[in-house]
Regions:
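Short, acidic, metal-binding catalytic loop of nucleotide-sugar glycosyltransferases
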Residues: 63-74
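Acidic donor-binding/catalytic loop of UDP-sugar-dependent glycosyltransferases
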Residues: 86-87, 134-149
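Glycine-rich, basic loop-to-helix element that forms the pyrophosphate-binding segment
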Residues: 107-124, 145
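Membrane-embedded multi-pass helical conduit in multi-pass membrane proteins
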Residues: 7, 23, 282-370
């Protein structure tokens, strides 16, 4: 066996292992999607909205929350104002005149989203807390579906789905990336090692949040979702996932590539603080695999000669490429279908995955060296 064949075989084995894992994720997504909810009609719930500026987006979200089908008397909504420079207080106060369950909570101590969430949890009247970003949109059945999911699958932390909407090349990349990340969220949860969460749609029990210390001691500004997940895991708390149609929230993609890059630098910075060696190693292999396939393909084209196991090398190499990309495209398509989006576009998904393999390692490195500004503040 020549060195060419041996390397191609090694790459195929790794790709096949990744394909098996991704196919297992597809099965997990199907099982989670098939689960039903319980009767949450009498479950009280607090919806927590930390906000800094973005009054127009907040107004749209509050309209969605006001239209919820869950009993209004059981649905408390708290808007925690993180020192906004826009008229957030005026907006909330005007709506609260006709909506007594809506509360405005200005932050008196500290700053940042984590401090805002902790202030909101302290003020919450109910045990079940639903966290949502101020720029998210949701369907009228969202709150009721969250309550039903907690009834059917009792847990301390509930991971919920987020769909990104966007136009143009940059928007398309973000849409596909978010779908792939949601697949990874459900997949790693099914493996017993959940790594991802999204603060735009997250629910937890107030007593569990307080028991793990909330965000006490966290020095990073971002990462409220992932750090809470890691704290819950370390404390042995129960983590569940639900993806029912009514649970989805929609967020707009960053309008420009520059803003999308800044957003990803912020996200990558928080992932560097996650302490899970096994999952980290597997993620590193998954990130580097397409690079290894690309480098070996280029070398094979440039240097391999007839007689060096040419046929076997290229058979294994093509199989490795297929084992890497086909399951990823399929699982991303599964998420698109769950989100009720238009018919999945495998070519578009494949192109976005290729782009992700190029920019993800670069962002991971740059995020260690550079902290972007977010909402007027330098991220720590």
């Amino acid at each position: 066996m020549t060195s060419w064949v041996l390397i191609a075989l090694s790459l195929f084995v790794v790709s096949a292992a990744m394909a098996l894992r991704t196919n297992a994720w597809r099965g997990a997504i199907a099982r989670v999607a098939a689960r039903g909810g319980g009767d949450g009609s009498m479950v009280p719930i607090t919806v927590l909205v930390p906000v800094r500026n973005g009054a127009d987006e907040l107004a749209a979200l509050l309209q969605d929350l006001h239209a919820q089908g869950h009993p209004r008397a059981l649905t408390e909504v708290i808007v925690v104002d993180d020192h906004s420079e826009e008229p957030v207080q005026r907006l909330v106060s005007s709506m609260a005149r006709q909506w007594p369950q809506l509360r405005y909570l200005p932050m008196e101590e500290g700053a940042g989203k984590k401090a805002a969430i902790m202030a909101g949890v302290r003020a919450a009247q109910h045990e079940l807390v639903l966290l949502t970003d101020a720029d998210a949109r949701c369907a009228p059945g969202r709150v009721a579906a969250v309550a039903a999911a907690f009834q059917a699958h009792p847990c301390d932390l509930l991971l919920l789905p987020v769909r990104t909407e966007g136009d143009g090349l940059c928007g398309m990349l973000q849409v596909e990336e978010q779908a792939a990340l949601l697949a990874a969220l459900v997949g790693t949860w099914s493996e017993g090692r959940p790594m991802l969460a999204n603060g735009a749609n997250l629910a937890f029990r107030r007593t569990a949040f307080e028991a793990v210390g909330g965000y006490l001691g966290d020095v990073r500004d971002s990462g409220d979702d992932v750090f809470l997940l890691q704290r819950m895991r370390r404390a042995g708390r129960t983590v569940e996932v639900a993806v029912d149609a009514a649970l989805w929230v929609r967020v707009q993609a960053a309008p420009s590539c520059g803003e999308a890059l800044t957003q990803r630098l912020r996200w990558a910075g928080k992932m560097g603080a996650v302490r899970d060696p096994v999952s980290g190693l597997v993620s590193l292999v998954a990130l580097l695999l397409p690079w290894a396939l690309t480098v070996f393909t280029v070398l094979a084209v440039a240097d391999q000669r007839v007689g060096d196991g040419l046929l076997r090398t290229w058979t294994l190499l093509l199989a490795a490429w297929a084992a890497w990309c086909v399951p990823l495209v399929q699982v991303t398509g599964d998420v698109h279908r769950l989100a009720g989006e238009e018919r999945p576009r495998p070519v578009r998904t494949f192109a976005a995955l290729l782009a992700f393999t190029v920019y993800a390692p670069v962002i991971a490195v740059v995020s260690r060296l550079y902290r972007p500004r977010w909402k007027g503040r330098r991220i720590r």
